[in-house]
Design a protein with these regions (language model features):
Chain A
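Amphipathic alpha-helical dimerization/coiled-coil segments
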Residues: 89-115
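Beta-hairpin "wing" of winged helix-turn-helix
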Residues: 63-79, 85
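N-terminal helix-turn-helix DNA-binding core of bacterial DNA-binding proteins
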Residues: 11-54
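Basic amphipathic alpha-helical segments that dock to polyanions
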Residues: 55-62
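Intrinsically disordered, low-complexity serine/threonine- and proline-rich regulatory segments
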Residues: 1-16, 97
C-alpha cells in the first residue's frame, strides 16, 4: 500500500505528493492528470519534477479516500480527458497535510539552524 | 462511517473494474500523447519526443498494477484466476473429480443431514423473549401427577412448593408454573346444541404469558388477576386450534364456551409461532385456579402432597445454573424438613432438584434422541474424516502426476505461497462442489434419517435453513483445507531441477499416504465395531421372550369417550363388543385393554398389604394395569395359580386383581398369595382393597431391556369411573385369533361398527408390529451405523487400493531388478501383500484402543452385550484384513506380471 509513496526519484520530498496534488487542485476548479503534472512543475520553476506516471496511482488512492472526484470532459484541444476536482473531505485533508508538512519543515529548519 | 463509504467506493470499483482499466488506459495515453506533442513542438524528432515522454512518465505496466493494487481487489482477481484455473484442472481429470466430489458429497451431505436434525431437535429455541435466561426445575418430558411422598430427582412440584419458590427467588427474576400433564376437555360453544368437542387443555399460572414475554395474536393473554380465587373463568386459545376450530375468526374473542361443564370466556389467542413450552401442545390454556372445575376433583392447590406442576424461571443476570440449582435444592430440603415430617430423613437427604436450561422448552424429542443424535454426529464426523483422508490420498497421487507442471511454475518465478494458495483453491473448490451436491443429498437424507430415528413424524420441517447452509459451507471449506493442505505443502516443495530433467525418483508423500490409509483403517474399525455392537443389541432385544402370544393378537384402537359414552356405560358397551367379536369365526377370545403393551404409558403406585405393617413407600411399588374379562386367555399369558379376570367381575362385586409372578415372588415369598388383599397407597384402605384371585406368568409390558417389574391387573369393569379421568376408557380391543391374523382386520372393524356405529376405530394392527415398533430406535441405530460403516469400509478399500497401486507403479523398476536377479513371482506377491498387511496392522493397532475408548460412550445404548465384546472386535479385525487383502490383490497381480526387461528398459 505504501509503494506509491516511493517516487523512485529524490526530487520530491517523500510523503508530499498528496499535498502537492491537493494544493494544485485547490488552486483551480478542475484539472486532468497532465495539467496537474505541468502545474506542479511550472509553479516550482521546474525544481520539483514528478515522475509523471506516479500521479495516477496516487489519484486512484485519493479517489478511494474520497478526497477528489473525477469525471470525464473535453480538453481545449477537443480531447477526452478525466478531470479531477477537490471534495470537501479533500479540502479538509489539505489542511491536515499542510499543518503536518509545516511541523516537519519547521522541525528540520530548527535542527539545521541550531548552532 | 468513513470506512463504510470507502468500502462502498471500493465495491463499486469491483463491479466496474473493466471500465476502470479502460479509463486508466485512456488517461495515461492522453498524458503521454500530450507530453510527446509538447516535446515535439519544442523541436525534438518524433522518436525522441516519444522516448522522452516515456522516460518522464515511468513504467506504465508497473503503474497500472500499482493503481489496481490501490483499490485492494488484487486478491479477488487472483482468487478468480485460481478458481478459473482450478475448474479447468478439474475438468481435465473428470474421473478424479467425480470420485472426489461424490465421496465428499456423501460425507458432507451426511453431516449436513445430521446437523439439521440436531439443529431442529437440540438447538432450536422457543419463540419467546430472551429464551436463554429460562431454566426448568425439571426437563423431564413425562407428564403426570404424583401424590404421596417424593424423593430422589424431583420432576413435579406441589402448589405449595411453587408458592414457596416464588417467595424465595433471590436468583430468579420471575417464576411461572404450568401443569405437567394436560386435560381432556369437552368443549361446547355456549348455547349450541351440538355434541361437545374433545380438546386438550393445560392449566398455567396467570403470569405464564407475560413471563414468556408474549403478546396476543388476538384479544389479550392471561394476567395474574385471571388466576386469583374468584376470578371470572377465562381461556386463551392456541393459534393452531383457533385456525382449526374457528377459522381465525376474531369475533370469537369474548364468546363464552362450556369447558367440562363450567362456562369460560375466550379472552384471546396466543401468537402463531408459539405452541407451548412443552412438546405436547394443548389446544387451549386455562388458569391454574380452575383446576377443580377442569379436572372435576378436589383442589390440588390445597394438597401439599399433590405434585402436579412444572416450574420455569428466568435467571437473574450473572447467576449460573449451577449456583441457582444448589440454592433451590437446599431450599427444597429445608421445606421438607420443616413440614409435617411426612418424609423420612433418608428421603429428604436424597431429594434434589436438577435445573435444566429452558431455552428449548420441554422436548420429548430432545430428551429421547439427544444421545442418539450425538452418537450419529460422531459417526458422520468420522465418515467425513475418512472421506477427507481419501481425497487427500487422491490429491497426493495426482500431485506426483503434476510434479512437472508445478516445478515449471516454480522455475518461472511463482512464489511458494502463491502456489499453495492455488492448490488449496482447487481443494476448496472440490469441497464446495461436494458440499453443494451434499446439500442436495441431505435434503432427502434428512427425511430418511428423521424417519429412521424418530419413526416418521415430520418433526423437521424447513430443515435446510440458513444456519444449516452456513454449517455446510464451513464444513466444506474446512474439509477442503484439511485434505488439501498437506498435499499442497508437499507438492510445492519440489526439487525442480530433478523434475524438469526427468531424473526424479522422489519418494514424495509416501509416509504420509501410508499414515492416511492406516488412520482410515483405524477409523473404519471404530465404525464397524460400533455397527456390530448395535446389530447384536438389536438381535438380542428382538430375541427377548415377551411372555405373550404377540403373533396372534390383533389390536383395534377405539375411543368410546369421543363417541360420547359416559364411564358408567362402558362395561356394557365393552362386553357387547367382546361378545360380537368372539362370534367371528377364527377368533379365539377377545378383551379390552386400558393401556396397550409397549404403548409407552405406565401407572405406578405404592401399596399396602392387609395385615402387614406399612413399609417405606420406595420399596412397595407396583405397576397397575386395567383389563377386561378373559384378559390372560386373550393375551396368551399362562395363569400359574388361581383364575383369570372373568365376566363375573362386574360393578358391585368385591374388587379382584391378578398379580404377576414377580409380584408374587417379591411380596409373597413362600406363601400362597391367592385370597390375600392389598390396597394402593398407604396406609391400608379396606374400602379400596383388592383380593388377589390369580397369579399370571411374567410378561414384558414396558421394555425389552429392563426386568419385568411387579404388576397387578385390576378388573376394570368393577369400577368403571375409577381413578384418573384419562384411564376411565379402554384404549383398545384385543383379539386373539387362531389362523392368519392379517386376514381379519376388516371383519373386526365391521363387527365393532355393528355394535356402535359412532365408535371411532383409529387402526387395527398386529401386536407384534407394535412391539417391533418399540425397537425402532435400536433398529435405526443398527441400520444407520451399518450403512455408514459400510461406506467407511468401501472408502478405506479405495484408499488401500490406491496406495498399493501407487506403490507398485513406483516400484516397477525395483521389482524388475528383483525378478531379473532371480526372485520368484510368489516372492513379489509376498512383497506387496506384506506391505498391505503391515498397513492394516498399523491401522488395527491404532484403531483397537480408539474403538475401546469410543464404544464406552455407546455402552448405555447396548443390551445383552459388553462394549468391549471380544467376538465383535475379532470379527471386525478379520473382516478388515480380508477386505484390505482383496483391495491389494489387483496391484499385487500387476506387480507379479512385471516384465523385467520392460521394467529395466523404462527410463
Amino acid at each position: 500500500m505504501l509503494r506509491s509513496y516511493d517516487l523512485h526519484r529524490d526530487e520530491i520530498p517523500p510523503g508530499t505528493l498528496y499535498l502537492l496534488i491537493l494544493k494544485t487542485l485547490a488552486r483551480s476548479r478542475e484539472l486532468h492528470g497532465y495539467e496537474i503534472a505541468n502545474s506542479i512543475q511550472r509553479i516550482s520553476d521546474g525544481v520539483l519534477e514528478v515522475e509523471e506516471g506516479s500521479l495516477y496511482p496516487a489519484l486512484q488512492r485519493m479517489l478511494i479516500k474520497g478526497w477528489v472526484t473525477a469525471k470525464w470532459g473535453t480538453t481545449a484541444g477537443n480531447r477526452h480527458a478525466r478531470y479531477y476536482q477537490l471534495t470537501t473531505a479533500g479540502r479538509k485533508q489539505l489542511g491536515v497535510e499542510m499543518s503536518q508538512f509545516e511541523r516537519v519543515i519547521g522541525a528540520i529548519t530548527r535542527v539545521i539552524e541550531a548552532v | 462511517m468513513i470506512w463504510l463509504r470507502e468500502l462502498s467506493r471500493r465495491l463499486r470499483m469491483l463491479v466496474h473494474r473493466r471500465q476502470f482499466e479502460v479509463d486508466l488506459e485512456e488517461e495515461m495515453r492522453l498524458h503521454l500523447e500530450l507530453r510527446q506533442q509538447e516535446q515535439y513542438q519544442s523541436g525534438m524528432t518524433a522518436d525522441d519526443a516519444r522516448a522522452a515522454a516515456r522516460r518522464r512518465f515511468g513504467n506504465p505496466t508497473a503503474l497500472r498494477e500499482d493503481s489496481r493494487i490501490a483499490w485492494g481487489w488484487e486478491w479477488f482477481e487472483h482468487l478468480a484466476q485460481d478458481v478459473r484455473y482450478g475448474l479447468r484442472m478439474l475438468r481435465k481429470s473428470p474421473g478424479f473429480t467425480a470420485v472426489a466430489v461424490l465421496t465428499l458429497a456423501l460425507g458432507i451431505g451426511a453431516n449436513t443431514a445430521i446437523f439439521s436434525l440436531i439443529d431442529a431437535i437440540l438447538l432450536r429455541t422457543l419463540p419467546v423473549a430472551s429464551p436463554h435466561e429460562l431454566v426448568l426445575f425439571s426437563d423431564s418430558p413425562e407428564g403426570g401427577t404424583n401424590s404421596g411422598t417424593q424423593t430422589g430427582h424431583w420432576m413435579r412440584f406441589s402448589s405449595e412448593n411453587y408458592t414457596y419458590f416464588r417467595g424465595h427467588s433471590e436468583n430468579f427474576k420471575e417464576l411461572c408454573a404450568f401443569q405437567s400433564s394436560w386435560n381432556h376437555l369437552k368443549i361446547r360453544v355456549a348455547g349450541a346444541a351440538e355434541r361437545p368437542d374433545l380438546a386438550y387443555g393445560r392449566l398455567v399460572s396467570g403470569n405464564f404469558f407475560s413471563f414468556l414475554g408474549l403478546t396476543a395474536a388476538a384479544g389479550r393473554l392471561f394476567s395474574p388477576d385471571d388466576d386469583r380465587p374468584g376470578a371470572s373463568p377465562a381461556v386463551v386459545l392456541n393459534y393452531a386450534y383457533w385456525t382449526r376450530k374457528f377459522q381465525n375468526d376474531v369475533s370469537i374473542i369474548g364468546k363464552v364456551v362450556e369447558v367440562n361443564g363450567t362456562t369460560f370466556t375466550i379472552i384471546g389467542v396466543a401468537p402463531r409461532t408459539f405452541s407451548d413450552v412443552k412438546y405436547d401442545r394443548p389446544d387451549l390454556w386455562l388458569p391454574l385456579v380452575f383446576q377443580p372445575q377442569v379436572m372435576s376433583t378436589n383442589s390440588y392447590a390445597d394438597d401439599p402432597q399433590m405434585y402436579w406442576l412444572s416450574i420455569m424461571a428466568r435467571l437473574k443476570p450473572g447467576v449460573t445454573l449451577r449456583q441457582a440449582q444448589a440454592v433451590v435444592s437446599s431450599q427444597l430440603k429445608q421445606i421438607l424438613a420443616t413440614q409435617a415430617q411426612r418424609e423420612t430423613t433418608q428421603q429428604i437427604a436424597n431429594s434434589y432438584i436438577e435445573l435444566a436450561p429452558g431455552a428449548g422448552g420441554i422436548s420429548y424429542l430432545r430428551v429421547t434422541y439427544s444421545e442418539a443424535l450425538q452418537i450419529l454426529a460422531g459417526i458422520v464426523g468420522i465418515v467425513l474424516l475418512i472421506v477427507c483422508a481419501n481425497v487427500a490420498n487422491l490429491l497426493l497421487s495426482r500431485s506426483s502426476a503434476r510434479e512437472k507442471e508445478i516445478s515449471i511454475r516454480l522455475a518461472i518465478g511463482a512464489s511458494r505461497s502463491r502456489l499453495i494458495r492455488q492448490l488449496l483453491t482447487e481443494s476448496v473448490l472440490l469441497a464446495t462442489l461436494g458440499g453443494a451436491l451434499g446439500i442436495l443429498a441431505a435434503r432427502w437424507g434428512v427425511d430418511i434419517l428423521a424417519s429412521l430415528v424418530t419413526g416418521g413424524t415430520s418433526i423437521v420441517k424447513d430443515s435446510i435453513d440458513a444456519r444449516v447452509l452456513l454449517f455446510t459451507a464451513c464444513v466444506s471449506i474446512l474439509a477442503g483445507i484439511l485434505f488439501g493442505l498437506v498435499p499442497a505443502l508437499r507438492s510445492s516443495r519440489i526439487d525442480f531441477a530433478a523434475q524438469v530433467n526427468g531424473s526424479a525418483r522422489t519418494r514424495l508423500g509416501f509416509g504420509f499416504a501410508n499414515g492416511l490409509v492406516a488412520c482410515q483403517i483405524a477409523a473404519c474399525l471404530v465404525l464397524l465395531v460400533g455397527a456390530g455392537l448395535f446389530l447384536r443389541t438389536l438381535q438380542k432385544l428382538a430375541d427377548q421372550e415377551l411372555g405373550f402370544d404377540e403373533n396372534h393378537i390383533l389390536v383395534a384402537r377405539i375411543n368410546a369417550e369421543a363417541a360420547g359414552y359416559s364411564p358408567a356405560q362402558t362395561p356394557t358397551l365393552y362386553q357387547a363388543l367382546i361378545d360380537r367379536i368372539e362370534a367371528i369365526p377364527g377368533v379365539l377370545s377377545a378383551t379390552v385393554d386400558y393401556s396397550e403393551p409397549f404403548g409407552g404409558s405406565t401407572w405406578t403406585s405404592n401399596f399396602t398389604i392387609e395385615g402387614l405393617p406399612s413399609r417405606p413407600p420406595g420399596q412397595m411399588k407396583v405397576h397397575k394395569e386395567l383389563v377386561g374379562p378373559h384378559y390372560f386367555e386373550t393375551e396368551g399369558i399362562p395363569i400359574l395359580l388361581g383364575r383369570d379376570i372373568g365376566p363375573q367381575d362386574r360393578p358391585g362385586t368385591p374388587l379382584v386383581t391378578v398379580i404377576n409372578q414377580t409380584m408374587a415372588r417379591k411380596f409373597f415369598p413362600g406363601v400362597n398369595p391367592i385370597g390375600r388383599r392389598f390396597s394402593l397407597g398407604s396406609p391400608f384402605n379396606d374400602n379400596e382393597a383388592m383380593t388377589i384371585v390369580g397369579v399370571a406368568a411374567d410378561a414384558r409390558y414396558y421394555s425389552l431391556r429392563d426386568p419385568v417389574p411387579a404388576m397387578e391387573f385390576c378388573a376394570a369393569f368393577q369400577i368403571p369411573d375409577q381413578g384418573s379421568h384419562n384411564s376411565a376408557y379402554a384404549e383398545d380391543v384385543e383379539v386373539r385369533v387362531s389362523g392368519n391374523p392379517r386376514a381379519l382386520p376388516t371383519e373386526i372393524r365391521a363387527a365393532l361398527a355393528q355394535v356402535s356405529d359412532s365408535l371411532p376405530v383409529t387402526r387395527v394392527t398386529l401386536l407384534k408390529d407394535e412391539v417391533s415398533a418399540s425397537l425402532r430406535l435400536n433398529r435405526s441405530a443398527a441400520e444407520v451405523s451399518s450403512a455408514f460403516a459400510g461406506l467407511a469400509l468401501f472408502l478405506s478399500c479405495i484408499g488401500v487400493y490406491g496406495t498399493m497401486a501407487y506403490r507398485v507403479s513406483r516400484r516397477t523398476h525395483e521389482i524388475g531388478i528383483r525378478l531379473a536377479l532371480g526372485a520368484h513371482r510368489s516372492d513379489v506377491l509376498w512383497l506387496i501383500t506384506k506391505e498391505c498387511l503391515i498397513l492394516v496392522s498399523v491401522g488395527l493397532v491404532i484403531g483397537v484402543p480408539l474403538a475401546l475408548a469410543s464404544t464406552r460412550i455407546i455402552a448405555s445404548q447396548l443390551f445383552g452385550i459388553r462394549a468391549t465384546d471380544p467376538l465383535t472386535f475379532a470379527t471386525v479385525a478379520i473382516l478388515l484384513v480380508l477386505v484390505a487383502l482383496a483391495a491389494c490383490y489387483v496391484p499385487a497381480r500387476r506387480a507379479m506380471r512385471v516384465d523385467p526387461m520392460v521394467a529395466l528398459r523404462y527410463e
